[in-house]
């Protein structure tokens, strides 16, 4: 017998799970809950979320309430009579009245090994912290943030060059498999959630654009990780003089033979350009830029940018 599901999600990372459940012979996705259309692009035209577009393409009814915890929407969801509701990066906290609607509760797929990195940016936080292992967790939603009992986990190695986008792409796929098996176990009454440990709790709030600004006073390994952690969103950036420049991942290797000796004392934010590389000083060793994106332009090779911009020899990144 098919389990009636309402799927709640918004960004592209939720698509593997949504598609997996739609195509499953054991589940019936009766409706999709997503955030309202949001402004996108230079013109700021409202656009449907990636999850909304997938639901529309599949002919699945869309629910896009501005206030999902309002009594009006709680009543509307009740009329759909879901047996279980599923959340993958929906983008809003759910209150007790809404959580009480489905008899089998709400199941969340979260992209960390809970209780580590509760919150909106677990993948970014894991990379920035220098973690080598992360994963995805399915758990029963409670009113408090990402604290509910756990159904299952899957682990994933963080590669030394992983950006948040790279890692999230893999977790979205492995997490979709975990979520499907979790729902099967709940339906078969063979899966019992276990409480999260009280130790090891950490939090990963959403990263703002201002927080993605590079602090060159930090040691090179920290700078390198933080840039990867905010790539592609919201994107690392710095000021070069008064010009704002977005940065792609940088390279750091304190033992690299191509690092000129004169760069060793390069001050934090100091810029050195030669015929094949652009280096910026940090609180320890310099890092080499790969790609940069000046305001209003596309990403380009850092050397081409530096030569085209005709940087002042005293120019600094800040």
UniProtKB/Swiss-Prot annotation:
Belongs to the Fmt family. This is Methionyl-tRNA formyltransferase. It is an enzyme of class 2 (transferase). Its EC number is 2.1.2.9. It holds the Pfam family Formyl_trans_N. InterPro entries: Fmt, Formyl_trans_C, Formyl_transf_N, Formyl_transf_N_sf, Formyl_transferase-like_C_sf, Met-tRNA-FMT_C, Met-tRNA-FMT_N. GO terms for cellular component: cytosol. Attaches a formyl group to the free amino group of methionyl-tRNA(fMet). The formyl group appears to play a dual role in the initiator identity of N-formylmethionyl-tRNA by promoting its recognition by IF2 and preventing the misappropriation of this tRNA by the elongation apparatus. The keyword rRNA-binding does not apply. HAMAP family: Formyl_trans (MF_00182). It comes from Mycobacterium leprae (strain TN). Keywords: Protein biosynthesis, Transferase. It comes from the Bacteria. One of its GO terms (molecular function) is methionyl-tRNA formyltransferase activity. The gene is fmt. (6S)-5,6,7,8-tetrahydrofolate binds at residues 112-115.
């Amino acid at each position: 017998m098919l389990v009636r599901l309402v799927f709640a999600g918004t960004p592209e990372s939720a698509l593997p799970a949504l598609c997996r459940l739609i195509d499953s012979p054991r589940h019936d996705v009766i409706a999709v809950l997503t955030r309202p259309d949001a402004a996108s692009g230079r013109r700021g035209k409202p656009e449907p979320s990636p999850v909304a577009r997938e639901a529309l393409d599949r002919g699945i009814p869309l629910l896009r309430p501005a206030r999902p915890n309002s009594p009006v929407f709680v009543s509307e969801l009740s009329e759909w009579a879901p047996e279980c509701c599923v959340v993958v990066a929906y983008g809003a906290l759910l209150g007790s009245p809404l959580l009480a609607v489905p008899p089998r509760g709400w199941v969340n797929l979260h992209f960390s090994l809970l209780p580590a990195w509760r919150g909106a940016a677990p993948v970014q936080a894991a990379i920035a912290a220098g973690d080598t292992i992360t994963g995805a967790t399915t758990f029963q939603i409670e009113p408090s943030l990402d604290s509910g009992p756990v159904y299952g986990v899957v682990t994933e190695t963080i590669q030394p060059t992983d950006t948040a986008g790279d890692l999230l792409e893999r977790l979205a796929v492995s997490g979709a498999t975990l979520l499907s098996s979790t729902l099967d176990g709940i339906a078969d009454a063979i899966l019992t959630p276990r409480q999260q440990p009280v130790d090891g709790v950490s939090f990963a709030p959403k990263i703002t654009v201002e927080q993605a600004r590079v602090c060159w006073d930090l040691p090179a390994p920290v700078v390198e990780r933080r840039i990867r952690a905010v790539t592609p969103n919201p994107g690392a950036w710095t000021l070069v003089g008064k010009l704002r420049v977005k940065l792609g991942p940088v390279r750091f290797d304190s033992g690299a033979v191509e690092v000129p000796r004169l760069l060793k004392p390069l001050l934090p934010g100091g810029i050195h350009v030669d015929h094949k590389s652009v280096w910026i000083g940090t609180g320890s060793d310099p890092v080499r830029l790969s790609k940069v994106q000046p305001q209003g332009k596309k990403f380009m090779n850092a050397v081409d940018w530096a030569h085209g911009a005709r940087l002042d020899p005293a120019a600094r990144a800040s």
